[in-house]
Swiss-Prot record:
It comes from the Bacteria. The gene is tilS. ATP binds at S28, G29, G30, L31, D32, S33. Transmembrane segments: none annotated. Keywords: ATP-binding, Cytoplasm, Ligase, Nucleotide-binding, tRNA processing. It catalyses: cytidine(34) in tRNA(Ile2) + L-lysine + ATP = lysidine(34) in tRNA(Ile2) + AMP + diphosphate + H(+). This is tRNA(Ile)-lysidine synthase. GO terms for biological process: tRNA modification. CDD domains: TilS_N (cd01992).
Length: 442
């Protein structure tokens, strides 16, 4: 059977995005992205493709790279494709490879318009190297699934249309069309792990197992399918854990949360799968050996206040739910004199407070819980606020941010908590609107 031309394979890979708002090639000037850009430029002569453009990210990590933007400009000019050059700062410390990648993808996202597709030139050999590299690092299924053919990126999508094409095929195309490209000297440095795999390990594997690269890439595709199935299962379980209940909190408490009991009924593996899907959008998660914090939070008694601290925040329990609190969640500062109680009061870092109904006589002040407060209730007399909040099922992490209304030293109301947010005689209610643009409450 004759080989399918690269042009046809590329068109097939990009078929789902033919109606995109534009195709932008991540153009380093190296062999792989040069071939991808040239292929697309040739196809655009005979096919109705989305508008083509290119983006070169300049890391400034080595002197040789300073000439690459000019090379990329010359290539794009010859092909009639507009080019943007984005200069980035790479964070120092840690892995320079990872820091450069992070800076590069931030630039990709910042330059990708709504509905546009960013095209990168990773190929079959890259996929095999990624699988082996992550296997050596003890990655889980998601990591071993290697690079997806496409994924969301900002308001658009990132696509890798050459994952089924070998490095040798790209080299043959470049030579046949007499293309010029730049060589990154750092790609020859075996101190970088990926370079060591590419230059030392992969050739030895291929010399003994000629189909090693194709086999590893095929394995990654199987693992990707398994990972997709687990993602579907996580979505099903998440829906079950997001069903409203009588213990659910109203919309004003806009924090990510899921119900605890449906989660507890799942197997341990399904619990971890669900939490990875949910929390993976919010924070970096630990490896599988460091989930004892989740087990402690899950299994703690009802009167406990367990916390699982993660990189970007923490998980807490309360009101039959598990809640995500970002790292900048904090108790609010007070007190504040409410000089014009007929008008809403802006609370620094904590939204807005309003009195609905007839305004009570003053002077009024707003503060937060400090301990020892009591509240007079109709038919119940004076009751300890801590006990009242326990009865109302108010999560412990929320109590330091609930506004309290005082007249002199008398506690009049607790915002938003039914039965506690208005006086014994009625006539008004204390309403709190948390800041929806605050990461701590959105």
């Amino acid at each position: 059977m004759p080989a399918v031309p690269l042009e046809s394979r590329l068109l097939q890979a990009l078929a789902p995005w033919r109606e995109a708002g534009g195709w932008c090639v991540a153009f380093s000037g190296g062999l792989d992205s040069t071939v991808l850009l040239h292929l697309l430029a040739q196809l655009a002569r005979s096919e109705a493709l989305p508008a083509l453009s290119a983006l070169h990210v300049h890391h400034g990590l080595q002197a040789a790279a300073d000439g690459w933007p000019a090379h990329c400009q010359a290539v794009c000019r010859s092909l009639g494709i507009p080019l943007r050059v984005e200069r980035v700062q790479v964070a120092v410390g840690g892995s320079i490879e990872q820091a450069a990648r992070d800076a590069r993808y931030r630039a990709f996202q910042a330059n990708l318009g709504e509905g546009q597709v960013l095209l990168t030139a990773q190929h079959l050999d890259d996929q095999a190297e990624t699988l082996l590299f992550r296997l050596l690092r003890g990655a889980g299924l998601r990591g071993l699934a290697a690079m997806p053919a496409s994924r969301p990126l900002g308001g658009g999508r990132l696509c890798r249309p050459l994952l089924g094409v070998s490095r040798a095929e790209l080299e043959a195309y470049a030579q046949a069309h007499r293309l010029d490209w730049v060589e990154d000297p750092s790609n020859q440095d075996p101190r970088f792990s990926r370079n060591y795999l590419r230059r030392e390990i992969m050739p030895r594997l291929a010399s003994h197992w000629p189909q090693a690269v194709a086999g590893m890439a095929r394995c990654a595709a199987h693992l990707r399918e398994a990972e997709d199935l687990l993602a579907e299962l996580a979505a099903i379980d998440l829906r079950a854990c997001r069903q409203p209940s009588e213990l659910d909190w109203p919309d004003w408490l806009d924090l990510p949360r899921i119900a605890l009991e449906p989660l507890r009924r799942l197997s341990a593996a399904r619990q971890r799968n669900l939490l990875r899907a949910w929390l993976g959008q919010l924070t970096r998660l630990p490896d599988s050996d460091h989930w004892a914090g989740w087990e402690s939070l899950r299994d703690a008694g009802d009167d406990a206040d367990p916390i699982w601290r993660l990189e970007s925040g923490e998980l807490r329990r309360g009101a039959g739910r598990i809640w995500w609190l970002p790292a900048d969640w904090r108790a609010a500062a007070g007190p504040f004199v409410w000089e014009r109680p007929a008008h809403p009061l802006l609370l620094p870092g904590n939204g807005r407070l309003a009195l609905l109904g007839e305004v009570p006589a003053g002077p009024l002040r707003v503060d937060y819980r400090r301990g020892g407060e009591v509240l007079a209730l109709a038919g119940r007399g004076r009751r300890d606020l801590k006990r009242l909040l326990n009865e109302a099922g108010v999560p412990s992490f929320l109590r330091g941010r609930l506004p309290l209304l005082f007249r002199a030293d008398e506690l009049l109301a607790v915002a938003n908590i039914p039965g506690l947010d208005s006086p014994r005689e009625g006539g008004w209610r204390l309403s709190w609107s948390p800041p929806t643009n605050d990461p701590g409450l959105s």
